[in-house]
Amino acid sequence: MFVDQVKISLKAGDGGNGITAYRREKYVPFGGPAGGDGGIGASVVFEVDEGLRTLLDFRYQRHFKAKKGENGQSSNMHGRNAEDLVLKVPPGTIIKSVESEEVLADLVEDGQRAIVARGGRGGRGNSRFATPRNPAPDFSENGEPGEELEVTLELKLLADVGLVGFPSVGKSTLLSIVSKAKPKIGAYHFTTIKPNLGVVSTPDHRSFVMADLPGLIEGASDGVGLGHQFLRHVERTKVIVHMIDMSGSEGRNPLDDYKIINQELINYKQRLEDRPQIIVANKMDLPDSQGNLSHFKEQLDNDVTVVPVSTITRDNIDQLLYQIADKLEEVKDVDFSVEEDENLGVNRVLYKHTPSADKFTISRDDDGAYVVSGNAIERMFKMTDFNSDPAVRRFARQMRSMGIDDALRERGCSNGDIVRILGGEFEFVE
């Protein structure tokens, strides 16, 4: 089964908790604090595996949770860092945030990695808070929560050649006779409902990867038919092979077919207009094909390549393969992905998901309580041990330093009012 788009949820590992401990040894009076830090939580890492061709594995498992870092120990021993959770994806995978729709990673090369959900840092043990004024602090920090987000994985096939055209023009038949691929072939429209890849070898021992894409129809760039679902696979092909039924056996005009498909490619992504294209006039064994071909060529520029073939009789197939291989050699040094990234407004390779740090918002619940939310304050809340009075006092100082107390006063919060953070309730005290 071919799967090229899936939504999954990721949870990076929380950092291990720091601990509160003291040095207790014979002949060492006033040994002082000795609580170790927690280990770093595991990150969720995506890695390209060139042996994969589909996102099928993610269809059956859609929730991924990385391991937590170990807690700190006494004698200033730090907890062990958790091992990253590595998820293998095929080349050409784009990772997008569901919430913001921004591109987090674009992975194209074998072994390429991207950290999409970063593990939390370990909480600090009490020895890290020792100061001359407080040489024996009796509080420590919980581990930082790991990042949690939903992402969409999209696969854009990395094929050298993409076969495009209306349904039933012979794309799957061509792929089946020039490679060992076995696409489904039938005498009805949309027999191909998923892309098929095949490795093609020419008689002079040159090879390339060809993708048979499902048939396009007018309006495909707007999602009509299979639309956007498979048009994106054309984006990374180096050469477009545009197949046309020159016999007009479906009752359509070959020239109209050519113009409609080209317009759909242009409408979908403007840069495809300049992508190298070879026109294949198929079904030349049928009546009216020669006359239609002559009229077709008269309407095109002289520099447009048109190769007449018959996938049934296999006439001129080798000549077509030579033409494709020659065109690929002409553009072998052109990186079409760079052009793609410029249009997307991002740089290829990898991106880091970084929530905004110090911003917070204040709202009111129906019962009149004030609700404070924001990445930084929620992270500090989770890292605070509320069973420790010194840790609670430190949390209150952090809220004041962030300006939350002043912001609450500006919103009308007064002595004794309830303030909520992530379900925890506090009483505002002047």
Curated annotation (Swiss-Prot):
- Broadest EC class assigned to this enzyme: hydrolase
Its quaternary organisation is: Monomer.
Q: Where is the OCT domain?
A: 352-430
Pfam families in alphabetical order: DUF1967, GTP1_OBG, MMR_HSR1
Protein's UniProt name: GTPase Obg
Q: Where does GTP bind?
A: 165-172, 190-194, 212-215, 282-285, 310-312
Which keywords belong to this entry? Cytoplasm, GTP-binding, Hydrolase, Magnesium, Metal-binding, Nucleotide-binding
Q: Can you list the GO cellular component terms from the UniProt entry?
A: cytoplasm
Cofactor names from the entry are: Mg(2+)
Q: Where in the cell is it found?
A: Cytoplasm
Q: What is its main location?
A: cytoplasm
This chain's function reads: An essential GTPase which binds GTP, GDP and possibly (p)ppGpp with moderate affinity, with high nucleotide exchange rates and a fairly low GTP hydrolysis rate. Plays a role in control of the cell cycle, stress response, ribosome biogenesis and in those bacteria that undergo differentiation, in morphogenesis control.
For the ligand (Mg(2+)), the binding residues are S172, T192
Q: Which Gene3D superfamilies match?
A: GTP-binding protein OBG, C-terminal domain (3.30.300.350), GTP1/OBG domain (2.70.210.12), P-loop containing nucleotide triphosphate hydrolases (3.40.50.300)
| UniProt-listed InterPro entries | G_OBG, GTP-bd, GTP-bd_Obg/CgtA, GTP-bd_prot_GTP1/OBG_C_sf, GTP1-OBG_CS, GTP1_OBG_dom, GTP1_OBG_dom_sf, OBG_GTPase
Which family does this protein fall into? Belongs to the TRAFAC class OBG-HflX-like GTPase superfamily. OBG GTPase family.
Which intervals of the chain are annotated as region Disordered? Answer: 118-145
Looking at the record, the residues that make up the Obg domain are 1-158
Give the EC number(s) under which this enzyme is classified: 3.6.5.-
UniProt-listed GO biological process terms: ribosome biogenesis
GO MF terms here are: GTP binding; GTPase activity; magnesium ion binding
Q: Where in this chain does the record put each OBG-type G domain?
A: 159-329
